[in-house]
From Swiss-Prot:
The keyword Ribonucleoprotein does not apply. Belongs to the UPP synthase family. This is Tritrans,polycis-undecaprenyl-diphosphate synthase (geranylgeranyl-diphosphate specific). Binds 2 magnesium ions per subunit. Transmembrane segments: none annotated. InterPro entries: UPP_synth-like, UPP_synth-like_CS, UPP_synth-like_sf. It comes from the Archaea.
Length: 238
């Protein structure tokens, strides 16, 4: 597609897949089928990302702590879809053939037992994979993540006297994930904010906002993301 060395491909892409509910209203379909299409698009996006072998990490913001304040009916729809997708992913050739390690970040105590069961199983069956890394933020909030980290310090798990930026990374939900700082954060749906997503990890991430609603995203949009990222000069505050 590109001449060798002409494009700088990000190794870690984080995605805020916004716009499922607006897609339902726009197309006249119900929330269940809109969210179902949104979840299917996550798999599509991962498939496209794996075609670019330099993309090693993909992180999705699937459900925030704020999202948990939505109606009971909407949450039941979401959790039913999550259960179905997690169960299917346990035997997904896309994961196993490419040796994708799957991790989940967030507060699992906020999630239904069946969802947690499948999360644990999926993490277990992929724990020895290391070619690629897929991280799903579920029941996650960036501020809550930092609070959990502070509690670990106060409990004595980490020595306060030697506490450093690097040790803070080891307190966060993303500890153990190679390159936990996204090179680029992509948000669909036209909104231009992080919405409490990876607040510490995104200090120097490039931000790209797409007007398209998440279910409308296609492979050409990932190509645009890569090309736009390649045009940027990352200065890391210097």
């Amino acid at each position: 597609m590109w001449a060798s060395g002409s494009v700088k491909i990000p190794t870690h892409i984080a995605v805020i897949p916004d716009g499922n509910r607006r897609y339902a209203k726009k197309t006249g379909i119900d929330f269940y089928h809109a969210y179902k299409k949104g979840v299917e698009k996550v798999r599509n996006f991962l498939t496209w990302a794996l075609e670019f072998r330099d993309i090693k990490n993909v992180t999705f913001f699937a459900l925030s702590t704020e999202n948990l304040q939505r109606s009971k009916i909407e949450l039941e729809i979401l959790f039913r879809i999550f259960e179905d997708e997690l169960r299917r992913t346990l035997e997904d050739p896309l994961i196993h053939d490419n040796k994708v390690r799957v991790r989940f970040i967030g507060d699992r105590s906020l999630l239904p037992g069946k969802v947690v069961k499948y999360i644990d199983e999926l993490e277990s069956v992929t724990k020895n994979y290391s070619n690629y890394h897929l991280t799903i933020a579920l029941g996650y909030g960036g501020r809550a993540e930092i609070v959990r980290c502070i509690k670990r310090v106060l409990s004595g798990e980490v020595r306060l006297e030697t506490f450093s930026e690097e040790e803070l990374f080891q307190c966060l939900d993303t500890r153990g994930i190679p390159n936990p700082e996204p090179d680029v954060v992509v948000r669909t749906g036209g909104e231009k904010r992080l919405s409490n997503f990876l607040l510490y990890q995104t200090a120097y991430s490039e931000l790209i906002f797409l007007e398209k609603l998440w279910p409308e995203v296609e492979r050409e949009d990932l190509v645009y993301i890569i090309e736009e990222y390649s045009r940027r000069q990352r200065r890391f505050g210097r």
